[in-house]
Amino acid sequence: MEVMVGSSFGIGMAAYVRDHRGVSAQDKAVQTALFLADESGRGGSQIGIGLRMSNNNNKSPEESSDSSSSIGESSENEEEEEEDDAVSCQRGTLDSFSSSLEDSLPIKRGLSNHYVGKSKSFGNLMEAASKAKDLEKVENPFNKRRRLVIANKLRRRGRSMSASNFYSWQNPNSMPLLALQEPNEEDHHIHNDDYEDDDGDGDDHRKIMMMMKNKKELMAQTRSCFCLSSLQEEDDGDGDDDEDE
């Protein structure tokens, strides 16, 4: 009994037989096989035993490359999805923060609801001019009357009260926009009478008038709008008086 190791295919078969998938028959067949030869006088009849293995272990290089590329693509897709989720979360937080910030701004709160949802963009100025009338808000007569009443009250209060009393000393931030002066008619008539009587003393009278005018300006100014220029003018007036004496 002899044991021989060889191929399961005969010599007459083609060395390379390919099926419709493009895989050779030798790749599918088992490379080793067992042959038993009987020497009992039959002239060496051979019995071939062939074993085939599954085709899962033997794959073409194209299939292996496709599987590896698919694995790489899946990992890349997962990374892109994670990045998209992170970006969407950041956008959501930024949008919520910006909306809350706009609501808290005084400009946003001061706008009227009449202009909500009416913002438009125009490429032609003629169209914007024609449609601007539609965006105009009709003034409420009650609000207009209220503003007029408040303005009249402030005007009457300003007439009845002097500048020094109207702007309190306790509030240093309150200051008039312009320097207010309240001329006194009685003092003006008295100075005119004195000027007519004393024609010879014109220079002295002018100096006295300038000093009186400077004192009135100082009295009209408040502590918050008290400036150094007024002090310098007062010092200059005192210096002139000392020189005359």
UniProtKB/Swiss-Prot annotation:
InterPro entries noted in UniProt: OxStress_Response_Reg (IPR051992)
GO BP terms: positive regulation of DNA-templated transcription; response to cadmium ion; response to oxidative stress
GO CC terms in record: nucleus
Main location: nucleus
Disulfide-linked positions: none
Claim: Metal-binding is one of the keywords in the record: no
Kinase-inducible domain (KID) as annotated region, ranges: 203-230
Keyword annotations of the record: Nucleus, Stress response, Transcription, Transcription regulation
Region (Disordered): 46-90
Position of sequence motif Nuclear localization signal: 143-151
Localization: Nucleus
Bias (Acidic residues): 75-86
Mitochondrion keyword on record: no
Taxonomic superkingdom: Eukaryota
Function: Probable transcription factor. Promotes slightly the tolerance to cadmium (Cd) and to oxidizing chemicals (e.g. diamide).
Protein name stated in the entry: Protein OXIDATIVE STRESS 3 LIKE 6
Highest classification ranks of the organism: Eukaryota, Viridiplantae, Streptophyta, Embryophyta, Tracheophyta
